[in-house]
Amino acid sequence: MQYQEVAGGICAPKGFAAAGVHCGIRANHNEKYDLALIKAEVRCAAAGVYTTNKVCGAPIKVDRAHLKDGYAQAILVNSGNANTCAANGVALAEECCALVGEALHIPAEDVLPASTGVIGQPMVIDPFARGIPAAAAKLTATAQGSTDAATAIMTTDTHKKEYAIQFELDGKTCTVGAIGKGSGMIAPNMATMLAFYTTDAAVSPALLEKALKTVVPGTYNQMSVDLDTSTNDTLIIMASGLAGNPEICEENADYDAFVAALTAIAEHMCAEHAGDGEGATHLITCEVTHAPDLKTARAVSRSVVCSNLFKAAVFGRDANWGRILCAIGYTPGDFSIDKVCVWLSSKAGEVYVCENAAYHPYSEDEAAKVLAEHDILVKVDMGTGEASAKAWGCDLTYDYVKINGDYRT
């Protein structure tokens, strides 16, 4: 399937506007945007997936209630405070939804809140009471609106994350756009990671939810920075239907094409998140092929990108392939490692370091050149089947410890 990258992020699909403002949630950052608002022209089919952490943010509890009917029209996101483990958290999130509803003239139940930031900090309504009307007044269906919203949700991210692609459904041009944040507390089973998708494809609520839950296991659940699963992981999608394609109401060719488009944009966003891991100097992608089954392929690729020993080796530009084999070896499951082959690759070239689970002659100098690049691909051929999977991670650096040691200061 062909995709074309387009500008505009979440405002690229028809029917969406966005804004970002500073409202004072980040009291020690006088100018930094800390509140994002996304609004649809029409009531949208909507779906979400959330953290697996038993401690979850108050906004997630509100989202789950508001999404029971499968529809939404606005998303409100704040950074600087997670609204987690706060006595008044749910009530405050509901009050924020009411303020958005009042500002946009929509039901409060059609508003989905999300928060990211420090866990366990008190939260008050005052900044939201100022910021929500300001964000509503600033809403724009332009690329700048998406950029401002993407900027407002950042915490320790070093750059904004947004992307959009176009594709065809039944002769109609459809668009999917995304923004996201997250560079720490990122581990499989969603990550401290917020992601918001918009699309103008017409998809029923039931099929939209199914599509999202089909895409997440092979993308967002395959991403890791530090093995910490956040309390606030949130991925929400709204579908306006304004592209004019026949509504996808069953699992047919159009549904498969839509899932493929979602997968493409999710893979791009995962690479953006992992490559911007706290203190990271390298994006590590592990691509497993010829695994005995999909479960094993996913588990092995996750093990490699989660290995602190291998992550540290990449930081040191050390082609220590034994650490890759070690990570594969402790992966749960019943599979053989006898035919495992490993390559390290980047735009500087490729080195074949392991053949049939044993050393393959290579140049350490060439390997160091490969590992000097930002984007590193680890190719693992298990030689035992036809299944494949990817996972995304980053190297482990001194700065990761420094950033997290200073997080609240």
Residue map of PLM features:
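A structural signal for small-residue-enriched, beta-sheet-centric alpha/beta enzyme cores
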Residues: 1-91, 95, 101-409
